């Protein structure tokens, strides 16, 4: 593994609160609320309008994606991403801090962290502990929407951090990359259904290793430390000195794998953007593994 100085992937609630208190928010520092919830559970934009971190803009993951794709949450184009984040006052010189309101402490924030990185922006961090701990620690909130001055952002896709269906299919034979799936064990094995999914059976890509993303978080919603994270990878026999692809259902919690590896000093984990949603619909049946299906047979 090549050792390099990595931009801090996490910032603390204390650091952000102090940055806000001392007037550092502006073109050089922007905060994004990247919350998203399953339909019928919570309304992310409504909750943002009710209360959010002062100065935060709402990052709508439903809007900032490839809406023409048949698969969930696929990346937008370079131009689409650049236009969207530019409207949020983000330039190539902005430090971006992302959080979400998930009770686990973090869910969609690592996806947005990865999106910035895959489009060439390295000065991006996740708020460690999320909005859950921001509230718990008594930091200020507001209902006032943020209206930043638009900025110019130039997006350059870093293809080394992104894997396609064809590349993962080829990897079944070449085995050049390790493959880690971040969904729950039941969904990975095929013994539990995919939530809110019509026509999508659970299971996994042949050869994948299961590391549920919740294992990277403490009970209090903070990211575990590098030593604990390395131990998790070692337990699963995932070699952080070798190439690694992360996958899940739709390329969201896979970004937790990328973040955890980054915190261990490995910044080059690629995400299979289509993940299981695409794989289930396109891949040969023999490349899909499901205990649930085999038990029914």
From Swiss-Prot:
GO terms for biological process: cyanate catabolic process; epithelial cell differentiation; rRNA import into mitochondrion; rRNA transport; sulfur amino acid catabolic process. This is Thiosulfate sulfurtransferase. Formation of iron-sulfur complexes, cyanide detoxification or modification of sulfur-containing enzymes. Other thiol compounds, besides cyanide, can act as sulfur ion acceptors. Also has weak mercaptopyruvate sulfurtransferase (MST) activity. Together with MRPL18, acts as a mitochondrial import factor for the cytosolic 5S rRNA. Only the nascent unfolded cytoplasmic form is able to bind to the 5S rRNA. It catalyses: thiosulfate + hydrogen cyanide = thiocyanate + sulfite + 2 H(+). Its EC number is 2.8.1.1. Substrate binds at residues 187, 250. The gene is TST. Residues 144-159 are annotated as: Hinge.
């Amino acid at each position: 593994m090549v050792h390099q100085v990595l931009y801090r992937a996490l910032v603390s609630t204390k650091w952000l609160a102090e940055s806000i208190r001392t007037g550092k928010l502006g073109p050089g520092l922007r905060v994004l609320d990247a919350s998203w919830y399953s339909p019928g559970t919570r309304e992310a934009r409504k909750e943002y309008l009710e209360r959010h971190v002062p100065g935060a803009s709402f990052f709508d993951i439903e809007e900032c994606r490839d809406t023409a794709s048949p698969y969930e949450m696929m990346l937008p184009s370079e131009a689409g991403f650049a236009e969207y984040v530019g409207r949020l006052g983000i330039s190539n010189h902005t430090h971006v801090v992302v959080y979400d309101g998930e009770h686990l402490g973090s869910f969609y924030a690592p996806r947005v962290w990865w999106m910035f990185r895959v489009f060439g922006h390295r000065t991006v961090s996740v708020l460690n502990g999320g909005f859950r701990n921001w509230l718990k620690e008594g930091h200020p909130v507001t209902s006032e929407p943020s209206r930043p001055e638009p900025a110019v952002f130039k997006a350059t896709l870093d293809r080394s951090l992104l894997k396609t269906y064809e590349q993962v299919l080829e990897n079944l034979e070449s085995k050049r990359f390790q493959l880690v799936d971040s969904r729950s064990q039941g969904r990975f094995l095929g013994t539990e259904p995919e939530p809110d999914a019509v026509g999508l059976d659970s299971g996994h890509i042949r050869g994948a290793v299961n590391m549920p993303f919740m294992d990277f978080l403490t009970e209090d919603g903070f990211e575990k430390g590098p030593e604990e994270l390395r131990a998790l990878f070692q337990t699963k026999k995932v070699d952080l000195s070798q190439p690694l692809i992360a996958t899940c259902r739709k390329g969201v919690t896979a970004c937790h794998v990328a973040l955890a590896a980054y915190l261990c000093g490995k910044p080059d984990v690629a995400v299979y953007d289509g993940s299981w949603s695409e794989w289930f619909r396109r891949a040969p049946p023999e490349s899909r593994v499901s205990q649930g299906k085999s038990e029914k047979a």
